[in-house]
Amino acid sequence: MGVPDCLALPLLVTFLLLSLGLPVLGAPPRLICDSRVLERYILEAKEAENITMGCAEGPRFNENFTVPDTKVNFYAWKTMGVEEQAVEVWQGLSLLFEAILRAQAVLANSSQPSEMLQLHVDKAISGLRSLTSLLRALGAQKEAISPPDTTQVIPLRRFTVDTFCKLFRIYSNFLRGKLKLYTGEACRRGDR
């Protein structure tokens, strides 16, 4: 029940190009605009949050990890340009990715790593990579790199976490909040 040999190579090349964030013919360029796609990643993040809430005495980080503030001032968000929103989302994803990679290292160095935690950390890393590729296809990276000169980019508010529970709560909240708001606006703007 494997993939026929005639399809294996094109499929492999497509996955390789997607993982590098390059456009692929036949790949929907605005896949992130399908709400079901983002909801899948949000559901995975929420599952990780729920699992780690049950293990409050789980492994703590030996140092604090910096993560983005997930609070959204809706008035301020609406008045921001889509370029400013893109910058905030890219900065947040970058901080989350770095924190989750560091959490993966904590598990790797743990004397008794939890398989469940490892599974959710691996899913989060995979999810963040996929979301990054999907946002590139949407053009978010171009918006984040070249905000208009008139726009002053305000540094992203941050704070620190010291447990897996807090890390996954931030991850889940960021996807449900700022990322969802940004993609919704960017997709609507692209439909005009």
From Swiss-Prot:
Instruction: Mention any Pfam family matching this sequence.
Output: EPO_TPO
From which residue to which does the signal peptide run? 1-26
Q: Where in the cell is it found?
A: Secreted
One of the record's GO molecular function terms: cytokine activity
InterPro entries, per database record: 4_helix_cytokine-like_core (IPR009079), EPO/TPO_CS (IPR019767), EPO_TPO (IPR001323), Erythroptn (IPR003013)
Disulphide bridges, residue numbers: 33-187
* Glycan-carrying positions: 50, 64, 109
Primary localisation category: secreted
Tell me the GO BP annotations in alphabetical order: cell surface receptor signaling pathway via STAT; cellular hyperosmotic response; embryo implantation; erythrocyte maturation; erythropoietin-mediated signaling pathway; hemoglobin biosynthetic process; myeloid cell apoptotic process; negative regulation of calcium ion transport into cytosol
The entry's keywords: Disulfide bond, Erythrocyte maturation, Glycoprotein, Hormone, Secreted, Signal
SUPFAM superfamilies xrefs: 4-helical cytokines
An example GO CC term for this entry is: cell surface
| Its job | Hormone involved in the regulation of erythrocyte proliferation and differentiation and the maintenance of a physiological level of circulating erythrocyte mass. Binds to EPOR leading to EPOR dimerization and JAK2 activation thereby activating specific downstream effectors, including STAT1 and STAT3.
What family classification does the UniProt entry report for this protein?
A: Belongs to the EPO/TPO family.
Give the protein name, as stated in the record. Erythropoietin
User: What organism does the record attribute this protein to?
Assistant: Nannospalax galili (Northern Israeli blind subterranean mole rat)
